[in-house]
């Protein structure tokens, strides 16, 4: 069985946005949920729009959840 990717969303930066990593690779800086989901889609994660962003065990939110940007 394939291991699920580890998604880490860093705390908001002082200038805005949050760095997003998947399995240690930086995908970019997201400025909102739309950016975040697009990064995941480009990384090959399918059906990301159906993830419960608040409680998904795939996502580690640091410095606030999906409503903090």
Segment roles from a protein language model:
Residues 7, 18, 59:
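A broad, low-specificity signal marking well-ordered, structured residues that form hydrophobic/aromatic
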Residues 42-69:
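Mixed-charge, Lys/Arg-enriched low-complexity segments
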Residues 11-52:
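Amphipathic, hydrophobic secondary-structure cores in small proteins
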